C-alpha cells in the first residue's frame, strides 16, 4: 500500500494533505521539539550527529531521514535505532484510516492521494509522539517550502551548503533553490547556517529577517573576525587521528578543543559544527 503510492520526487506544492491527516490524529507533531534540516550536501550526516549530541545530553530522540539503504525502517529512528518491524507496522495501522479519509477527500476534489513520502512523514511524526521522544531531528526530503516535513513548527532550523539540485522541481538558479530551502524557517526560530555562496546566503538572510529568526552562521574564511557581521561558527583546527580526526570548534556558546570526531574528511568536521550548534540551540 505505501510503496504503491506516488514516488517521493513528485512534489505537489501543498501541505494540505499532510496537515489534514495530522489534524485528524490530534497533531502529534506538536508534542515534542523539532530540529528541521535542509540543504544540498550533508543533511543526513548532520542529522545523525545532531541526534547523537541530543541523546548524549539525556534526551529521548527521533530521527526522520531519507533515502534508506537496506530497509525502509531506517528512515524512522527512535533513540538512534531504526524503528522495529512491529513498530513500523503499528505506525502504519495507526495512521492508515486517516490517510484513507484524506485520500478520498483529495481525490473527490480532483487532487492526488498522499504520496509515498507524505505517508512516511506522517508515520514518523505519529511514531515519535507515541514513543514518546523529547526531540525529533527531521530531514527534508526535497527542497523545504513544500516538503511534507514542513508541517512542523520547528524552533531550530539547519541549512547545510546549498548547490544546484533537483532543478526540475526547485528552480534553475541558486537563488531559487535557496528560496525554497529557506522556506523551513519559522517565526522566532534559531537558524544554523553553513557557509554558503553569496546568492544563497542573501536569500537565507532575507527569510530569517522576515521571520525574526536568530541566525548563527558559519564564518566565511575571508571574513574579518572582528566584524559584528561575522559568523560565529567556525572549525578552528583539524588534526588527523586514529579512526577519525581531532577538531576544535567555535560556536556562539563556547570553544570546544580537540573534540574527537570518528569520521574522516573536512566536510564532516563542518557537518559536526552545524550539529553542535543545533544541539546548543535546543538546549538553550
Which residues are covered by each model-predicted region?
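Aromatic/hydrophobic pocket-lining residues that form π-stacking "cages" and hydrophobic walls in ligand
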Residues: 50, 124, 204
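Conserved beta-strand scaffold positions in the cores of enzyme catalytic domains, especially
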Residues: 34-36, 61-63, 151, 157, ...
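ATP-dependent carboxylate-amine ligase catalytic core
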Residues: 9-11, 15, 19-30, 56-152, ...
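A conserved segment at the C-terminal end of the G1
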Residues: 33, 37, 45-65
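Charged, amphipathic alpha-helical linker segments immediately N-terminal to NTP-binding catalytic cores
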Residues: 1-9
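Short glycine/threonine-rich catalytic loop with a Thr-x-Gly-x-Asp
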Residues: 61, 149, 263-276
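Acidic, Mg2+-coordinating active-site environments of NTP-dependent enzymes
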Residues: 102-109, 132-139, 154-259, 269-284
Amino acid at each position: 500500500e505505501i510503496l504503491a503510492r506516488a514516488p517521493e520526487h513528485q512534489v505537489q506544492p501543498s501541505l494540505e494533505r499532510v496537515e489534514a491527516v495530522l489534524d485528524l490524529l490530534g497533531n502529534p507533531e506538536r508534542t515534542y521539539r523539532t530540529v528541521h534540516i535542509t540543504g544540498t550536501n550533508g543533511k543526513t550526516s548532520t542529522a545523525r550527529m545532531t541526534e547523537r549530541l541530543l541523546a548524549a545530553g539525556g534526551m529521548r530522540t527521533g530521527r526522520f531521514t531519507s533515502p534508506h539503504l537496506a530497509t525502509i525502517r531506517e528512515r524512522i529512528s527512535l533513540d538512534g535505532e531504526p524503528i522495529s518491524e512491529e513498530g513500523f507496522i503499528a505506525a502504519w495501522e495507526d495512521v492508515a484510516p486517516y490517510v484513507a479519509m484524506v485520500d478520498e477527500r483529495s481525490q473527490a476534489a480532483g487532487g492526488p492521494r498522499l504520496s509515498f513520502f507524505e505517508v512516511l512523514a506522517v508515520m514518523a511524526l505519529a511514531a515519535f509522539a507515541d514513543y514518546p521522544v523529547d526531540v525529533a531531528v527531521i530531514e527534508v526530503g526535497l527542497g523545504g517550502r513544500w516538503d511534507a516535513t514542513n508541517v512542523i513548527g520547528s524552533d531550530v532550523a539547519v541549512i547545510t551548503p546549498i548547490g544546484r539540485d533537483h532543478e526540475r522541481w526547485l528552480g534553475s538558479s541558486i537563488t531559487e533553490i535557496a528560496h525554497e530551502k529557506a522556506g523551513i524557517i519559522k517565526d522566532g526560530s534559531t537558524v544554523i547556517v553553513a557557509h554558503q555562496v553569496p546568492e544563497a546566503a542573501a536569500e537565507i538572510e532575507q527569510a530569517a529577517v522576515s521571520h525574526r529568526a536568530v541566525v548563527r552562521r558559519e564564518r566565511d574564511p575571508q571574513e574579518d573576525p572582528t566584524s559584528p557581521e561575522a559568523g560565529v561558527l567556525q572549525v578552528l583546527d583539524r588534526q588527523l587521528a586514529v579512526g577519525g580526526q581531532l577538531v576544535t570548534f567555535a560556536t556562539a556558546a563556547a570553544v570546544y578543543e580537540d573534540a574527537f570526531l570518528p569520521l574522516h574528511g573536512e566536510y564532516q568536521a563542518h557537518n559536526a559544527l552545524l550539529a553542535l550548534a543545533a544541539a546548543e540551540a535546543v538546549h538553550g
